[in-house]
Structures are given as structure tokens and as C-alpha cells.
Amino acid sequence: MRHLRNIFNLGIKELRSLLGDKAMLTLIVFSFTVSVYSSATVTPGSLNLAPIAIADMDQSQLSNRIVNSFYRPWFLPPEMITADEMDAGLDAGRYTFAINIPPNFQRDVLAGRQPDIQVNVDATRMSQAFTGNGYIQNIINGEVNSFVARYRDNSEPLVSLETRMRFNPNLDPAWFGGVMAIINNITMLAIVLTGSALIREREHGTVEHLLVMPITPFEIMMAKIWSMGLVVLVVSGLSLVLMVKGVLGVPIEGSIPLFMLGVALSLFATTSIGIFMGTIARSMPQLGLLVILVLLPLQMLSGGSTPRESMPQMVQDIMLTMPTTHFVSLAQAILYRGAGFEIVWPQFLTLMAIGGAFFTIALLRFRKTIGTMA
């Protein structure tokens, strides 16, 4: 009972110390509000509401089909212009794509002459230019092939392909960006808060006080883990409900309590990593450099931004030992696909095992170095 009381009281001390750190409080609020909102609404790498202009010099049934095939959410409604206005519009940056459909286009297509359509792209808008060029090519080819097939043969196709988008019917990037921002910020803040809590002890000269008190390194470490983990757990839950579900209007398919249980297990592992890094760094700037070196690979290779199947096999095997890989997997399964515990229990068990391993390593390191931190 005395050990639990010591852990609780030391944790309260950590929370009070955090309340006096305005920089950390600002980082916490920013990470789960502005950062989440901007990640969800920023212009994505995929095509979204790209401005497009079309000079239809043919005015045929086929050219009208091509014009009407560009619609939201990939393109804004096409602006109809003349060929003479095309260069001026691109120079002024009014649209990213400008399409010139030549005269007699439909007649030449039906005659098998393979006419050309000119597509002008503003390549300075790199986020849309490369992807949009492929979209436009596929759309035009699809409309031309469909028109020619129906014109020459009025029979219905034997097979009709019906595509349905699961879990994100409108392919809205905000559904992915907002949730992934929360997942990444949970890992980042868990490491930063626990590591900085240890650095603060060194900078404020309170390590000596801890050494003369009847407490153990285990109690000190557990106090920092539960207090900083509780902060991240609470603010991430509020951000998921208020920002993602409320402000952004993203539907949450699965159980939020089940997701928060996964967050707690992930925090057990990542806060232990923060303690370990805090024993290595001698100051806040050093901790910041270590966080960059550790956090970037954890986030980039965990499967959140790039599918793990696209990575080399060796990288996949190495990342299986990291908690973020399993946390991203269970978070996406619960929040996107509505998975229950019967599906994500392997990730839960793996997080418990990885968390126990990181906690043991951090505790051994902490016991070894606490005397030299004074």
C-alpha cells in the first residue's frame, strides 16, 4: 500500500509540474487541436478539387461527354474557355489543367484517325499536377472507348462492373488525415512528456531530493508513466470526440472505449521509451534531437502513411518489434472498419509484451543512471 501511495503522490507532483510548464501545455493543446484540424483539411497528395478549364472546339456529343466527366471531389466544375484564353489562364494560375478538344474530334474518332487532345498542366502545383495528369488521361480514354463501343454496337455489355468504396465512400481525405494525426501525436507526446519530465528533475535540481526520500526508482518511473500517460489519454480522447467526430464530422465506426484501451497499452510502451531516452539525454535540446531520430522512423515505417506490404521484408520484420506498428494496425481496424476485440486481440497482446520489454529495459537503465543524474 505504501508503494501505491508513493506512486500516486509522485504522479500528482508530476501533474503539478506539468501545469507550470506553459510550453508543454501549449504543445499538448496545439497537437490535438490545430495539428489535427490542419492534417485533415490540408491539400492532400491525392487529387482534390483541382481547377480545370476546357476549350471545346468540337461541340459534339462525345466532347460533351468528356466535359461532363470531370466532377467533384477530384475536379472543380470545368470552366469553359476558348483556345485563345488558355495560355493567359494558365499564366495567371486560375486553373491547374487546361484541355483543348480539337474541331471534328468525334468524326475523326469514329473514322479511326486517332486524333489528339491537348492537355496543358501547370506543373508548379506539384501536389496535383502529376496525379491529375493520369486521372485526366484515364477519364478521357474511358469516355472515348465507351462512346465508340456504344456507337458501333448498341448491345449491352455482358459484364457490368460495380465499384463500391468501403469505409470511406466519398474518398474524403479528412477521414484519414484527422485520425492519423491523433495516432501520431499520441506517440510523439508520450515520448516527449515522459522524457522531459525526467529532464526537468535534472534541470530543477530535484533529483537529489528524490534520492534521499524513501522511494525506489521503480516508484519514480511508474509515477511519471501513469501521470504523463493519463494526460495523453485524456486529451487524445477529447480530440477524437470533439475535433475528429465533432468539428470535422468524421464518423467513428468502432468502439471508442476499445480504442482508448489500445491507447493505454501503447502509452505503456511509448512512455517507457521516453524514460529511456530521458536517461540518455543530458538536456532538453539533446532530448529533442533524440526524439527526431526515433520518432520519424516510428511514424513513417509503422504502416500509417505507407502500407507495410510496400516496404522491404527486413524493414517489416524490424518494425514488428515496435509498439507503433501494432498500435496503428489496431487503431485503423477499430476506428475505420469497426473491428471488435475478437479481431484486434493479437495486437493487444503484442502491445502488452512489447510494453513489458521496453519497461524492463528502461527501468534497468533508470536504476543504473539515477545516481549520476544529480
Curated annotation (Swiss-Prot):
The chain crosses the membrane at residues 23-43, 173-193, 230-250, 256-276, 284-304, 343-363. Residues 44-172, 251-255, 305-342 are periplasmic. The keyword Endoplasmic reticulum does not apply. Keywords: Cell inner membrane, Cell membrane, Membrane, Transmembrane, Transmembrane helix, Transport. The keyword Membrane applies. GO terms for molecular function: ABC-type transporter activity. It is a multi-pass membrane protein. It is found in: Cell inner membrane. GO terms for cellular component: plasma membrane. Residues 133-369 form the ABC transmembrane type-2 domain. Residues 1-22, 194-229, 277-283, 364-374 are cytoplasmic. Belongs to the ABC-2 integral membrane protein family. This is Inner membrane transport permease YhhJ. It comes from Escherichia coli (strain K12). The gene is yhhJ.
